[in-house]
Structures are given as structure tokens and as C-alpha cells.
């Protein structure tokens, strides 16, 4: 298209030139006409060459610039000839030059358009090639999709055939099932008749045996209920006694604190008096030294001066002795203060250890309560007994909470008192006891300024005693629960070991038929085992109450709050505060409880022997693994 437009423009330009020369031809001389003819022939050849064969047009794309330059040269030659023409033709010459310039510009525009068209053609060719490549890819994908579709159709046909085969087989199996059900119904009808005949003869004896077994279990449960009620009453009595004992101990300690505060006030007054007296003596001593340093007057009589000197020397020696004694006493008090500080640190460490042990003991109690909850779910027939056990536990938890609240309150008071102990003169709380223990002719020495340290010490001792009582109770409860679960676990271990024909009296304390035969009485054996477990729990509660009675009010031991008289005397002699050895008082009680538990509970004796033979059983507070392995057996 671009070549055609270019050729049409060239043809139009040539026509315009012809018309122009034809117009201006009559006034031109013969030489000019000749030139015009020659130019016309050249133009005709150029036009004929421009409109010639397609081969000439193909060459004209690249060869049009030389033809146009030739035409321009032809046009310039007549212009040079026209320069000779008069001035009337100069205007025409200028017009011709303008037309030449316009033709040159048109030529440049045409060349520029040709280049742009070439670029567009190249881009179109590239786009066509890319489209061809994409078409090829699409054709390849189409072929793959066709193959996939063919394979899927083939697999669908295969699955349809298989489904038809399966439907046919299912119909055959349903028919076979119906035939088998008919045959089985006929067989079961005959077997039911035979079984009913056999069962009618055996059911009477089994029902009688079940009735006897249920009566025995009911009697055992009633006995267990009575034992648990008695143990609950004993626990309540022990709680009341312990509360009264705590009230008495608190009153006694309050009275003791009042006495100590009165003593502290009196010691304050004595300290002030002693300070005043020491200052007075120091003044008199300084005066005496000053008098001795001054020269004696020459005229005084000899006898009174010697008497005065002796008197002054004696008084000086006495004052020096008092000062020396005061210094020694202060040194002793500093040593006692250091010892008291060390004891306070030790007691604080013990208190921290007990506080760290409390969460561990709570975790142990929770671990012991978890298997108890599982036994509740398993033993549905002992719900009433387990409810009573839960009530006892709740009472114990309430007691523990009350004691913990009291301990926390006392701890807050102790922290307040210990913050007061941070004042200067800390730890000098044992001087008055030393002054009371020693009957010396010299005056009462000075007292430390921290007078609240004695009150803090007594409150601290009271708090430690209550902590010791709480730890005793927690350890006793752990012992009771531990022995109870250990007995149950040993009973459950001994249950499958015993022979089918024998009784289970060695394994369970209830005396009932704890185990059943291999083919009869499985549920009855489970109920009897649960009843035996309940009796063991009652026995453990009795033993636990005895442990509490012997631990709280032993006949040969003083109360845990009050120190022994021998210890008080020793404390007065050494000039130290009254300290009660809490750890020593806790350990023998635990030993007595551990020694008395097998004798109180008859079922614990074989268990203790077995535990001594096998120390691995029951060494931890949690339930052993073989008990959990026995539980699915019992569910069956």
C-alpha cells in the first residue's frame, strides 16, 4: 500500500510539471523547446519507467531517490538556460525553485513513511511468528487433553463394569445372608429351648447364692458405715480438742508476751538509770583525775589528805572495775546477739523449707485423691461410704485452710515485727535473762535499744510451732492415705493369685468371698472386693484417729507450744531465749505413728512384711503401676 501511494504521488507531481511546462512553452526559444522536448522525453521515460513492470516497481522501492535526483538535475538545467531570459521570467524561475523544494520535502516524507511501514511490517511478522508458536503449543495441549479424556472415558467404563459386578455380588450375598439367618433362627430356637431347660434347674440355686452374697455385702456396708461415722465423730472431737488447745496456747503466749513487754519496759527504765549513773561516775572520775593532776596545797593537814586519797583511790578502783565489767558485759551481749542472729537465720531457713514443702505435700494429697476418685467411679455400690470419706476430706481441708490462714496472718505479723528489727541494736534480746540468772553485787547492765526483738522472737517461735503442727498433721494424713492405698493395691494383687476354690481372707480384711470362680459370680466378686476395700478404709480411719490422738496429746510429752522446764532453766542459765526444738518433737511422733500403725490395723501386718521383703512397693506416695494394670481386669 505504501509503494502504491508513493507511486501515485510521483505520477501526480509529474503531471503538474507537464502542465506547467505546457503553459509556459509558447514564449520559450528554440533551444529551450529542444531542451523541453528532451526533458519531456526524459519525463516520459521516467513515468513509463515508474509505471512499468512489477520488476521495475520492486527496484523502484530502493531506487527512487536516484530518479528523483535526475529529474531535479533536468529541472535545474532549464533554469540555468532561463537565466538568460529577461526579467519577466525570473518570477517563474523562483516558482519552479519553490516547487522543487516542495517536491524534495515530499520525497523526504515519503522516505520516512517507507521506513515506518518497514518497521510496522517487521513487527507484524514477529507477532505472526509468535502467534504461530502459540497455536502450535495449543495444538499440543489439545492432543494431550484428548489423550487424557480418552483414558478417563476408558477408566469410567472399567469402573462401571466393576460396579455392576459388585452389585451382582451384593445381591448374591444378601440372598445368602437371608438363607443363613433363616437357618440360624431355626438353630437358635432349638438352642434356646435347651438353655431354658438347663437354666431353670440352675437359676434357683444361683439366685439363692446371690441373695446370701448381697446380704453379706449389706452387713459389711452397714458395719463400714458405722465405723466411718465413729471415725468422723473422733475426727470432729480431735478437731475441737485441737482448737481448744490452740486457744489455750495463744492465750498463754499472749500472757507471756505481756510479761515480756512489762519486763522490757522495766529494763528500759533500768537502762536509763544505769546510763545516768555511768555518766555520773564518769564525771566524778574525771573530776578526781583533774584533782589528782593539780598540785596539792602546802598547808592542808596530813591526816585528812591521806584519808581522802585512799577514799578516792577506792572509788577510782570501783569505778574502773564497773567500767571493765560493763565492757565485758557488752562483749558478752554482742556474742549472744551474734548467736541469736545465727539462730534466727536458721529458723528462717527452716521456715522457708517448710513453706517449700507445703506445695509438694499438697500435690501429694492431690495425687492420692485422684486414684480415690477413680475408685469412686468403679465402685458404684459404695457411694455412701465414699461420700462420707469425701466429707471427712472436706473437713480436713477446711481445718488445713483455717490453719494456713492463721499461719499467713501470723506470718504477716512476723514480717512487720522483723521490719522493726532492722533498727540499730538488732538482736540484743537476751540480756535480762542473763541478769536474772546471775546474782552479782554489781548494778544491772545496759539493755539493747531494739526492745521489740523479743516480741518478734516469741511470735516467730509461735509461728514455727504452728508450722510444725501443720507439717505433723499433713504427714500423718499422708501416712494414713498411703497405707490405705497400699493395702488396697496388695489386696488387688493377691486377688488373682489365690486359687479359684479357696477364700480370699488372706488378701482382704472383710472376711467375705472376695473372689469368684472362673465361670460364675464375676459381679459378686467385684462387690465383695469393694466391700473389703471399704472395711480396710474404715480400719485406716481408726488408725489415723489414733495417730492424731497420740501425736497431739501424748502422756509422757509436754504440749508442743510450751517448752520443757529443763530447757527453760538451761535458757535462763545461758542468757538466751527459750527455743523449742521443733524438728526433734516432730520426728518421734512420726516414728510412733509408723510403729503403731501395723498393730492398730490387722490388715497392715502382712502388707508391712511384704513391703519389707519388697522395698520397691510403696516407696513413693503415688499408686503403683500394677494397681492401674488391675483396673481393666476389674471392669471386665
From Swiss-Prot:
Residues 509-522 have a biased composition (Gly residues). Disulfide bonds: none annotated. Residues 109-127, 429-441 have a biased composition (Basic and acidic residues). The keyword Ribonucleoprotein does not apply. The keyword Methyltransferase does not apply. Residues 93-148, 211-263, 306-412 form a coiled coil. GO terms for cellular component: cis-Golgi network. It holds the Pfam family GM130_C. Residues 38-50 have a biased composition (Polar residues). Residues 1-72, 107-127, 344-364, 422-449, 496-537, 588-612 are annotated as: Disordered. Keywords: Coiled coil. PANTHER family: GOLGIN SUBFAMILY A MEMBER 8C-RELATED (PTHR10881:SF7), GOLGIN SUBFAMILY A MEMBER-RELATED (PTHR10881). Belongs to the GOLGA8 family. This is Golgin subfamily A member 8F. It comes from Homo sapiens (Human).
